[in-house]
Amino acid sequence: MDIFKELIVKHPDENVLISPVSILSTLSILNHGAAGSTAEQLSKYIENMNENTPDDNNDMDVDIPYCATLATANKIYGSDSIEFHASFLQKIKDDFQTVNFNNANQTKELINEWVKTMTNGKINSLLTSPLSINTRMTVVSAVHFKAMWKYPFSKHLTYTDKFYISKNIVTSVDMMVGTENNLQYVHINELFGGFSIIDIPYEGNSSMVIILPDDIEGIYNIEKNITDEKFKKWCGMLSTKSIDLYMPKFKVEMTEPYNLVPILENLGLTNIFGYYADFSKMCNETITVEKFLHTTFIDVNEEYTEASAVTGVFTINFSMVYRTKVYINHPFMYMIKDTTGRILFIGKYCYPQ
């Protein structure tokens, strides 16, 4: 949650989307080559950020069922002028590749083609400009997720409706309609304002959680106050309701990847990117991470969610049932998570593209 909160401060009026599990798995790869205080910082950060982080990055898709796909693209690119330790290369296996950074354009195309392949063509260009010829090592991270809704929205019900970017700015969106679905829902009143949480299941064992503030501009208060602990507490308050859901189709495509170096430094990982970086388990030379790039893509429509980021059967009596109507027509937060609570993606949607 902390990386996401740092990003939304830097991008207050933009759509933001990251994949925490992808970022953490990449940090785990780096940790294989870290020593001393660098290893201590990395180990502590990974432990504090996500207790469910897999020990091996290749296990990221263990809990993803046949009806969904999760493909991660995490890679360390190291200079071919450096002799890396065999023990390090054995640990990370396919997650490492040597390149000639002096041939900047070729290296750029190599990285972009790899990311395109790993994300099923949804992310075509992680790098929009060549890396510096002085680069010694670069970490890139991308992820692709696709899952079918457990309760698909009917395409013939989709209509054009208003979306309030702010109280004074209104645009239009394609609004999807899901009726009479039994979903996990709660409305919560906190000191900073009221909001609704709705858990929308996919086929299998993952779901999208929407946090929708009551106030059109209430997203800013949620951003300031949400924590991992509060999110878990709020989700524990969910209960089954009959819901009429009005949700916009939306797509988020990043034009530039996030460089997470300054954000991770702000969060305490100071001994990875600077003078005190110790990657002596990686190689004998002094080396530091110069870039940590992360990019994502998401497409939410009537049939499925696709990101280049379960529930049981509920029964009701045949009687008059009060249905809660949820209109997602202004900025909101969303998470895609699995049944363990592991957040695969977290984002903010505030500006239809």
Swiss-Prot record:
List where in the cell it is found.
Host cytoplasm
Q: Can the keyword Iron be found in this entry's annotation? A: no
A single cellular component GO annotation: extracellular space
Q: MF terms per GO, please? A: serine-type endopeptidase inhibitor activity
Q: Which Gene3D superfamilies match?
A: Alpha-1-antitrypsin, domain 1, Antithrombin, subunit I, domain 2
Q: Where is this site: Reactive bond?
A: 318-319
According to its UniProt record, where is this protein mainly located? host cell
> What is the protein's name according to its record?
Serine proteinase inhibitor 1
Q: Which organism is it from?
A: Vaccinia virus (strain Copenhagen) (VACV)
